[in-house]
Amino acid sequence: MPAAGQAVTRSLRVNDLAFAFHEWRAKPGNHEPPIVIAHATGFHGRCYSAIAEAFPDRRVIALDLRGHGRSEGRPIDHWRTLFEDVSAILDQLRIRRAVGVGHSMGAHTLVQVASENPEVFSRLVLFDPVILAPEFYEDSGALYTSDAPHPTIRRKRDFDSPEAMMERFATRDPYSLFTPRVFEDYCRHGLREKPDGGFELACAPEMEASVYGASRTNSGIHDAARKVKVPTLIVRAQQGKSMDFKTSPTWPKLASIMPAGEDLSRPDRTHFHPFEDPEDAARIIAEFAAR
């Protein structure tokens, strides 16, 4: 049994797939509600290890969503699939009144979970939850298709080693924004060994591209946000019109439609706030959770 403060990876079966989650045990005698972390598209739960370790006394669970990290999964055609997975996982784990921490796609998913399962979370801290303005969802069809896929479909998938992946990505956006610890965690835990030798991306390019392609399918997300009654902090990065994720795509009015929503604008940060400054992200989580 790992000691408190050390991560152990476990798995369970949901929707006919094996899902992994990474758990940091609470210090004996600590009965605070757990922290549950849901990651961004193309990443995985261990990218948030530096944040989890900022809470050494507390139980922290970082999920690997469908087709990411150590979880099984096939490409999706609707974002509700992610919600259905996470809801079932948290139900199996008997999670109640947790502090939900989401980033990008993961944050979007936690909003849907909280709206339909109000007993699961007591608070939410959402880093750029990619819930765009309502007009974005007026056409709920696929944003990208198999004939015209998202550019991530061309992402390099095979590497000789984690070190080779680090060497290739170290100076590229957005990875050059990450702290060295987060970048190394992303690479070391973001590859799977291949049976014939070498490594491949744990999140296949087809999987990542399908998430982006389905990004406007959840047209009911604003109605879901209006039903979330727990205190919710929306942390938004610098605003901009580009979609390169150095700026925030999140609708600035999102917090205002949530019964207990609060907006925190951080123009000094990008969409990758938890990766470029995990210490600051952990501070935000701790302060909001302690209210």
What is each residue range found by the language model?
Residues A20-E72:
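Conserved HGGG/HGGXW glycine-rich cap/lid loop of the alpha/beta-hydrolase fold
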Residues D64-H68, V130, R269-T270:
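Short beta-to-alpha linker loops that shape the active-site pocket of alpha/beta-hydrolase fold enzymes
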Residues R96-D139:
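Conserved hydrolase catalytic core segment
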Residues R266-P278:
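Catalytic histidine-centered segment of alpha/beta-hydrolase-like enzymes
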Residues N15-L17, R25, S49, I61, ...:
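Active-site loop/oxyanion-hole signature of alpha/beta-hydrolase fold enzymes
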Residues R157-S242:
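Alpha/beta-hydrolase
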Residues F127-F159:
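A catalytic-pocket lid/entrance helix-loop region that shapes and gates access to the active site
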Residues R226-R269:
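Conserved loop-alpha-helix segment in the C-terminal half of the alpha/beta-hydrolase fold
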